[in-house]
């Protein structure tokens, strides 16, 4: 019944198996990829005909994580997989980027590649298996997929590179790098790094590239036995068409590329295109040529002009040399109500960035195959149509926006303080207000500025730069700080972000084969010099975090209570904690180890909540002194309320050393007095003294002592890297707590 073909190889100590012919047999191509207990189904479907009027290659990649693959039922009301998660979008892009450049340039059949995780093993990198599976499916499909791609993941632990590290190992790794490529060259790199050098990053790319060569051989073996006949392809346009356009319109195109302004240049090129269409109107009517062929030929001529000018004259569209960076302008504090803000402008690319602080309650909850976890740092990249002068409606975040936001997140995340140093959740919003290349790297620069303006104690400023490449045979030029046309007509988009001492994020997409490691090394070094220049310009505006937080930022304090008292603070059904939150207007976060974090808009609200928590959590000891309120006066003494919810009795003899005939002559209901706990009667009721409390307080200047340890006197509107939570018993700094938390508002 099944004509199954299976190929396997030992890869990094595990069996990698790729098979076809058993599942999804009606698709043009389908493979299952297995490693450990992970199983992925990767399919490819290619439309038989090209849609009328289409002028691009409609390739769609969808990566799906099925909840059942990890033995889970999806959350939410409908209990089924819905729209793609950010993780699924990011992996879909990871698959797309090395594969898309390898199709025949004239191929325009609608193509869908779907990779579904059917069984999930956290010890295997399913994103890497998805790239391998997609490449294998395409290799046996009718699509003109020109070269085979494979991928690997690289970690750096204890100074050693680790191939395909598990999620657990990645927690201690200095590097999380994905590299994909063909037998001859690297096609794509995506990474987050903890301030690694250019040389170390290049070593990691080489390590990953060499590691997946075994997988390419495996896919070739499968394709040799299982591949289907490929579509026969013709040239994108007749060479005679290009020659005729060159003869008639080359000078006009050259003049257009002398214009430095993006908008003016685009307008001129659009007019030239209309002239070309008018010239060939009869040929179009006679169906000798179509609009797309004419447009493609004109773009090829534009590319030749731009590329030759760079290679032969070392001059770019805007007049810069290959290493020049566009003019930079930085500004902070534009938005007075935001906790931090910055405007970063580089040439015709601009990013307006804001920083907002929140509490633990504001952390992003992420539901993944590994389980639910929380993200304390969030970065949202927004690319509105007006940034490129397009009249389009604003929509939900696109895949591109999700991908660019994650790249900027990777660049910033390694330099953020931990939760002990800075207890807030952080949201950065970067809106691209102008775009002409490298908007994601402008986001990185603007985010660094906004975080420092907000007072976040980051380890060092971060900047990003996008590098490009023009390569013809043995001649090549690496371009610093590319603009949009250089990205479009060039051969590489290579983004590098980092501090003055090392790289934090790297993303590389190559559009042609034959890029060797020498070129990558040159690009990395040129990017380092460009990054240092950008950091120098940024540092002129702000070079270190502000010592104080914005007046609009929430205040916070952390206290430590006995774990046995957590239930008393929460109360039945959360009654007590809700009452505290309502009366104080504060938010309270209680950890299982007894750490209580309190957040509010000002210190007065925090004090109200803190006093109420102390009142419940404190177990008074004999000899301690408290502030108390006279609740009731009797002939024999007075009842005193202290610590908010505790009562005691002061006998008339303990009120004063002087003789008192009538208690009401000395104390009245509502009076605030100092009291000292001197013992308990046989019913457990507290016995208090006023006279000794005042004696001890004045003689020893006794400070109230509670078994609640807090830093409530430490104002959070300052350099929060100096914030400490102390345990008075041993005077050691409390370590960061990573536990399940209980949240109340």
Swiss-Prot record:
Transmembrane segments: none
InterPro entries named in the record: ExoRNase_PH_dom1 (IPR001247), ExoRNase_PH_dom2 (IPR015847), ExoRNase_PH_dom2_sf (IPR036345), KH_dom (IPR004087), KH_dom_type_1 (IPR004088), KH_dom_type_1_sf (IPR036612), NA-bd_OB-fold (IPR012340), PNPase (IPR012162)
Region (Disordered) location: 693-732
Gene Ontology MF term list: 3'-5'-RNA exonuclease activity; magnesium ion binding; polyribonucleotide nucleotidyltransferase activity; RNA binding
Binding site for Mg(2+): 487, 493
Predominant place of localization: cytoplasm
Subcellular location: Cytoplasm
Short name of one Pfam family: RNase_PH
Reactions this protein catalyses: RNA(n+1) + phosphate = RNA(n) + a ribonucleoside 5'-diphosphate
Gene Ontology cellular component annotations, sorted alphabetically: cytosol
EC number in record: 2.7.7.8
Limits of the KH domain: 554-613
Domain S1 motif positions: 623-691
Cofactor(s) annotated in UniProt: Mg(2+)
Described purpose of this protein according to its UniProt entry: Involved in mRNA degradation. Catalyzes the phosphorolysis of single-stranded polyribonucleotides processively in the 3'- to 5'-direction.
Protein family: Belongs to the polyribonucleotide nucleotidyltransferase family.
Name of the protein described by the UniProt record: Polyribonucleotide nucleotidyltransferase
